Regions:
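Conserved beta-strand-loop-short alpha-helix elements that form
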Residues: 84-97
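Extreme N-terminus nucleophile/cap motif
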Residues: 1-51, 60, 152-178
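Short, surface-exposed beta-edge/turn micro-motifs
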Residues: 1-2, 28-30, 57-59, 77, ...
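Fold-independent oxyanion-binding glycine-rich loops
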Residues: 7-10, 63-66, 90, 105, ...
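PP2C/PPM family metal-dependent serine/threonine protein phosphatase catalytic domain
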Residues: 57-76, 166-170
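A short catalytic or substrate-binding loop motif that flags glycine-/basic-rich loops and adjacent residues
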Residues: 23-28, 71-72, 131-134
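Acidic loop->beta-strand submotif enriched in PP2C/PPM serine/threonine phosphatases
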Residues: 68-86, 129
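Short histidine
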Residues: 94-151
């Protein structure tokens, strides 16, 4: 299952070790957005290089993908972007994916973005549409400095994670190692 990491403005980017653990658990691409940056792709080291340029005074949404729908390619990495509205998803949706699109991108294009465009990110109409789609998933949206999260996120060191399954991949010293 994918992982979303939301970094509020003023909070440091997770360590390389944490980023590598998220990648190892979800190796099918990664991406991030801030109000002034957007990058996604299949090359982890390039991702880290771009992320290092992040302005700590801006919020950031990162996503690490484990492919469940759609092929493994840059176009299927999150976040998805339409007119400076960014969307990342963690989970599986009951949405029939469009040809070679993920369930996430299909939901964003067909259902979520049209409501955001018409009513605004914080409208009751968007909230209702989200709750009609989300089931047990997690969503993250960004428009400029404005971030909106849906679903339960775990807080660790000031960052918010859609799940902590990736922590299994963090190298630890064995208590009896010498």
């Amino acid at each position: 299952m994918c992982v979303i990491c939301y970094i509020p403005k003023g909070v440091k980017t997770p360590s390389y070790r944490m980023l590598k653990a998220m990648h190892n658990a979800n190796p099918h691409g990664q991406g991030f957005c801030t109000p002034s940056q957007f990058s996604k792709g299949l090359n982890f080291e390039y991702f880290v290089e771009q992320l290092r340029k992040r302005d700590i005074n801006e919020p950031c949404i990162m996503h690490f993908r484990l492919a469940t729908h759609g092929s493994i390619k840059k176009a299927n990495c999150h976040p998805f972007n339409i007119d400076h509205t960014y969307f990342a998803h963690n989970g599986i949706l009951s949405v029939r994916p469009m040809r070679d699109k993920t369930d996430s991108e299909t939901a964003f294009i067909r259902y979520l973005y049209p409501y955001i465009e018409q009513y605004g990110l914080h409208s009751p109409e968007v909230e209702k549409m989200v709750y009609n789609l989300i089931e047990s998933s997690k969503f993250a949206f960004m428009q400029g400095d404005d971030v909106r999260l849906f679903g339960h996120y775990e807080e660790m060191d000031g960052c918010y994670y859609s799940n902590l399954r990736f922590t299994y991949y963090i190298p630890r010293l064995h208590p009896f190692s010498f």
